[in-house]
Each structure stands twice: as C-alpha cells, then as structure tokens.
UniProtKB/Swiss-Prot annotation:
Predominant localisation class: cytoplasm
Residue positions of motif 'HIGH' region: 15-25
Example GO BP: methionyl-tRNA aminoacylation
Record GO terms (molecular function): ATP binding; methionine-tRNA ligase activity; tRNA binding
Source species of the chain: Lactiplantibacillus plantarum (strain ATCC BAA-793 / NCIMB 8826 / WCFS1)
Entries under HAMAP family matching the protein: Met_tRNA_synth_type2 (MF_01228)
Name by which UniProt lists this protein: Methionine--tRNA ligase
Catalytic activity, as annotated: tRNA(Met) + L-methionine + ATP = L-methionyl-tRNA(Met) + AMP + diphosphate
CDD domains: Anticodon_Ia_Met, MetRS_core, tRNA_bind_EcMetRS_like
Role: Is required not only for elongation of protein synthesis but also for the initiation of all mRNA translation through initiator tRNA(fMet) aminoacylation.
Motif ('KMSKS' region): 311-315
The enzyme's E.C. designation: 6.1.1.10
Family: Belongs to the class-I aminoacyl-tRNA synthetase family. MetG type 2B subfamily.
Length: 683
C-alpha cells in the first residue's frame, strides 16, 4: 500500500480585477508560491489556490465606463492576471474566478443554508458606502466628513481616502453579533490562528470588544453578482461570494465531488495583506462556524511593500510593475527581492537603490562570483571533475560543515514558521561563509605545493565549495526558479535531483564533470544607470527621459563621412514637421485584450487595450476589412497614439488611434515583440 503524503493547502486572497497588479500585489502570490514549492520539496501533497473576485458595483461601473459588459471586462482582466502569474512562474494548482458556474451555484447553496439555519435575516440598511472599498462605514468611522451649510453630513471619505455615498436599501443581514463571544473564545484557545500575534490583538481591541454588528450580505442597488436563489432581486454581497471561494474551489456545496474538500480542508495557511485581515479573521471564521465547518489552521497577514512616499499609488506615480523588472533583470531577481524585502509581519520598503544593490551585491557578487570562481578552480585544479567529499581534511572544513548544517536546520525552521525573508538570510550566511572559506584555504597556494597532503587538501576544498553550492542552490529553489537549475548544470549535476528533504553537505556526487567555462547567472548592472531607469519607470515627470537621452545622442553624433544626407530625396507625402511637433504625440505599447466588430458598423473593429493605464481603454479602428477574424489579434502588442483627443464614432467612444501600415491598398497593424511592457513609450 502506497504511503499517504501529508497534505498542505495554501491560498492567496482572490484579486479584484479593477486595475493592473503591481509588485506589491504580486508579493502575496510569490510568497505563497515559495511556500508551495518548499512544501512539495519536503514531500507534501500541496494544493495551491489563487484567483479573482469578479463581482460588485465597482466592476459594473468599470465596464460601463469602457462601454462593455461586466463579463467581457472581467474575462480580459482575468486573462491579464493569469498571464502575469505565468510570467512569474506561479505554480498554483487552481485559478478560481467568482464568475465560474460551479462557484456561483455553491454561493447560492451556502446562502440558502445560512438563511434556513436562521443566521441570515431580511432587513434594511442605511450607511455610507465606498464603491472602491466595497465597504459600508458609519459616520464615526469616516476619515473625513463633508457637511452642508446647515451642518448636515452630505458625504465624506473612507479611511482609505475614497469618497463615500449614502446608501439606503433592503438587505439580507448575517447575524455576526451572535458569534462574537464564540470568536473571542476561539482566539484564546487557538493563539496561533492569526499571525503575527499583533494582528490578533488588533482584531480583539478594534473590532470584537467594541461590539460586532450584523453584516449586510446582499445588495439590490446593482445586478452584477450572484442572485439570491429565493429572492433574485438581491445579489449576494462580497462577504459570502468572495470569502467562500476557498472552499468552493475544493468542491464544497457545488453539487459535484467534494473529495478535494475532504482531503485538503481546513487550509494550512491563508495568506492575506494586512488591510483584509479583519475580513479573514472575523467574518470568514464566523461564516465557517455557522456552516459547521472547521476553521483554517492559520491566517497570516503580511505587511505592505511601501515606497519612500508611502503606499504604491497610480495617482502618486510611484507604482512599478513586475513585468518591467522581469524584462530587465530576470525573474529570479524579482522573486528574490520581494521575498527578501518583506520582513515577517512588517512592511517592506522598495527603493530603486536597494533593488539594484541587491541584484549586484547579493546575487551577482556574493552568489554569482562564488559559482564562477568555483567552476574556474575545479577546471584548473581538478581537470573539471568534482572530487569525492571528505570531512575535516583542512583546518577550515569543520566550520564550513557546521555552518551548512546550521543553515539547513534554520532555513527549514524559518520556512515552516513563515519567516521567508529570514530563511533567505540564513542561506546567505552560508554564501558568505563559503566565500570566506576560499580566502582561508587559498587554493592557489595549495596548488603550488609539491606536498601530497596539500593535493588532498586542494581536492577537499574543491569538493566543499561544490557541496556548499549544491546546498545553496537546493535551499533557494523554492524562491528562484532558474538560478538553482543553472548552478546544478554548471556543476555537472542533474537539475532534476534538486531536493531539500534530507539535504546534507556531504551528499555530493563525486566524478561529475563541471562545464568548461562558467556563465554568470547574475550579471552585474550599472548602479547609477539602473537606478535612473527605475526612477523613470516610477515617476510620471520622468517618462520622457529616454527620448531626451536619444535626442541628445543625435545632437552629439558626427555625420558619417562620405555621405551627405541633405542630398537625399525623402519622398515626403505630407508637410514636414519639427521634432517639437512630433514630441507632442504620445506613442505607447498596448496589448489587445478583446476585439470584435462594432455592432451596426461593418467597417469598424472595437478594441479593448491595456496600455499600462489604471484602466483599459477603448479604440475603434476602421480596419475590419483586413481582419475578417479579429480574434486572432487578441494578445498582440500594438502601438497606439495615447494622447489623441477622444471622439465618438457610431455612438461609441474611441480613446486613441492604432498605428498601421498601408501599401497597395492593403492595411496591416504595426505590432511589436511580446516581451515589450504595456505602456512603454515609443520614441
């Protein structure tokens, strides 16, 4: 009978597809992916869930603004998020969308069960509602209150800074207040349920002790949601619709098999940002308890990845997107940085200077140079073959061996306790100790000696270096998906043998042939140039720096001798313009999200495009004649005129223009390589 593996179920929050995800959003998914990969390497049967929360008024309004329907809008956004996770090599087992049929069926069933059990009742709600936050607030909870001349409250701002509006409507309520004492008792008997511990203290003091209010769980003021089965004019609100995804994804209440639910629930770790800890540690546990289900073993609320001027915000112009960093520095650099930059439970800080420093110092210098030196010395001193590992041959071996053993032990402890940044710090202690070991043993001196003992020492040093790199590569493999395999390959080891379980320094396969010449796995970058590049990506006012640099280069360049451009016939078809005229035009890279023929206009195609803006934009183009199957354009990267004044065509708004080329009556869209980042400026 086959041995049953222990199970491990880990979830990210499901992401609200109202805009493009930045590196702060991506952290949660990369952190969960790191844990999922680690647990798989340790022999667990892992189920890793992520997805999108696709209902609500905000989505309905976004779609209306873009002249599309909500389903088409979220289809495009879900594809964009899936594409990002693929770029980041996220190893999720399932991607749930709250618009999936099985989820909607389950939500209706769950709502119906709670209603029949008496935990949900019909009432009327009046309060200040923030569309962006999808949350109601009392007047005392508002960060700012607006009053008329008579002192009457007429509006205000939520703690997030988003404006609120007064909403009064019939609503179904969940009896949250009924379970306050039970939840407090549960916290006290399960002190590890919420981590870090200060989050639990915050929940108790700020929300439970002041008194839990019953929770509105349906809406009638919009239609984009799951209808209540017994009362279809109501749609199920986010608290039941979104939170239950963690169990419906496993088959609970779907009417299908619940084998996955029985196998993996309760979740081992549910990782969320600190801003939604309340929903996952108050609303979610109470809903589960009312359904008679066990609670997740742990909810971990991580901090925010901040900029120097606070949270990332498109309005501040301080947002940076993962695609930019992956394209320029590689995926491993981004994954390493995000995991390293976020200390346990606290906020992390992103600065261009720190990011580039980590690429150069941690990756290129410390790890990359260690590999390069080791490969070069094994080729030079051992004919490219890994010597057999022997313990304690030199006076420095024992300390390196002890450091490796401690690193493995501490790394595993950090990973198991969700101290991911500390886990990497432990590995870099071994990286540092191994670099020091080279200086201590001075292999170049041992190689000059005629003493046979020194030859044995030299072989031992080479074996220890290779063995240490093998351990380092194995430990970082949950975080970095490329470098560990490359380290193994350069050492002549099979990347398929990368493993963390039962890892030991001494288990180095002898006789493997290293590569004849090592290749840098993390090339050094120019510090000043890269900091300037990143600042340009983060700051609105710096967007034209690249173009200005190009123009400066043109002015400084000397004309090639022997050729007079003034004599060239330019064959102009339109009046000449100056560079200042051209500089007024904003050309941007955009990705085609959806495209279809415009109803009632056979010549026009209706494009929805991601041009790196906060929202998608719509452009109408008269190229339908040349693209009889326009769906083939979905996913293509095109060039648009981004600052063309919007105009209406056939009753639809067109927010720009697509660039195309025409020859002999044939028209073709101009496309660019897929690896170009959406929103990149064309100069």
């Amino acid at each position: 009978m086959a041995e049953t593996k222990p199970t491990y179920y880990i979830t990210t929050p499901i992401y609200y597809p109202s805009g493009k995800l930045h590196i702060g959003n991506s952290y949660t998914t990369i952190a969960c992916d790191t844990l999922a990969r680690y647990k798989r390497a340790m022999g667990y049967d892992v189920y890793f869930l992520t997805g999108t929360d696709e209902h609500g008024l905000k989505i309905e309004e976004k779609a209306e603004k873009l002249n599309t329907d909500p389903k088409s809008y979220v289809d495009g956004m879900a594809k964009q998020i899936k594409d990002l996770w693929q770029l980041l090599e996220i190893s999720n087992d399932k991607f749930i969308r709250t618009t999936d049929d099985y989820h909607e069926r389950a939500v209706q069933e769950i709502f119906d069960r709670l209603l029949k059990n008496g935990d949900i009742y019909l009432g009327e709600y009046e309060g200040w509602y923030s569309v962006d936050d999808e949350e109601y607030f009392t007047e005392t909870q508002l960060a700012e209150v607006f009053r008329d001349d008579n002192g009457k409250v007429i509006g205000g701002k939520a703690p997030s800074g988003h404006e609120v509006e007064l909403v009064k409507e019939q609503s179904y309520f969940f009896k949250m207040s009924k379970y306050a004492d039970w939840l407090l008792d549960y916290y006290q008997s399960h002190p590890d349920f919420i981590e870090p511990a200060n989050r639990m203290t915050e929940m108790i003091n700020n929300f439970i002790k002041p008194g839990l209010e019953d929770l509105a769980v349906s809406r009638t003021s919009f239609t984009w949601g799951v209808p209540v089965k017994s009362d279809p004019k109501h749609v199920v609100y986010v608290w039941i619709d979104a939170l239950t995804n963690y169990i419906t994804a496993l088959g609970y209440a779907t009417g299908d098999s619940e084998d996955l639910f029985n196998k993996f629930w309760p979740a081992d770790v549910q990782m969320v940002g600190k801003e939604i800890v309340r929903f996952h540690t108050i609303y979610w546990p109470i809903i589960l308890h009312a359904l008679g289900l066990p609670l997740p073993k742990k909810v971990f609320g991580h901090g925010w990845l901040l900029m120097k001027d606070g949270k990332m915000s498109k309005s501040k112009g301080n947002v940076i997107y993962p695609e930019t960093l992956v394209e320029r520095y590689g995926l491993d650099a981004l994954r390493y940085y995000l995991v390293k930059a976020m200390p346990y439970g606290n906020d992390g800080l992103f600065t261009p200077e720190d990011f580039v420093a980590r690429v150069n110092y941690d990756l290129a210098n410390d790890l990359g140079n260690l590999l390069n030196r080791t490969i070069a010395m094994i080729n030079k001193y051992e004919d490219g073959q890994l010597p057999a590992f022997k313990a304690g041959v030199t006076e420095f071996d024992a300390d390196l061996e002890a450091t490796a053993a401690t690193t493995i032990k501490n790394f595993n402890a950090c990973m198991d306790s969700l101290h991911l940044s500390d886990a990497l710090a432990e590995v870099w202690k071994l990286v540092s100790r191994t670099n020091k070991y080279i200086d201590e043993t001075a292999p170049w001196q041992l190689a000059k000696s005629d003493d046979a003992n020194d030859a044995d020492k030299l072989a031992s040093v080479m074996a220890h270096l290779a063995a240490s790199l093998r351990v380092i590569a194995s430990l970082i493999s949950p975080v970095m998906t490329h470098a560990p395999k490359e380290i193994f390959t350069q050492l002549g080891l099979d990347p398929a043998t990368l493993a963390i379980a039962d890892l030991q320094l001494a288990d180095l396969p002898a006789g493997a042939q290293v590569v004849a010449k090592g290749t840098p796995i993390f090339p050094r970058v120019d510090m000043d140039a890269e900091v300037e590049f990143l600042k340009g990506k983060m700051t609105k006012s710096d967007k034209q720096k690249g173009r200005k640099a190009m123009e400066n280069a043109k002015h400084e360049a000397e004309v090639e001798q022997g050729w007079n451009p003034a004599e060239t016939n330019l064959n102009l078809t339109k009046p000449a313009i100056t560079i200042d005229d051209f500089d007024k035009v904003e050309l941007k890279v955009a990705e085609v999200i959806t495209v279809q023929k415009l109803k009632g206009a056979d010549k026009l195609l209706q494009f929805r495009l991601d041009a790196g803006d906060a929202d998608h934009r719509q452009i109408l183009s008269g190229i339908a004649k040349w693209y009889p199957e326009p769906e083939e354009l979905i996913g293509k990267k095109v060039i648009i005129v981004g600052n063309l004044k919007p105009r209406k065509l056939r009753g639809e708004m067109s927010q720009g223009m697509l660039l195309s080329a025409e020859h002999d009556g044939q028209v073709q869209l101009i496309t660019v390589p897929d690896n170009m980042v959406n929103g990149s400026l064309i100069s």
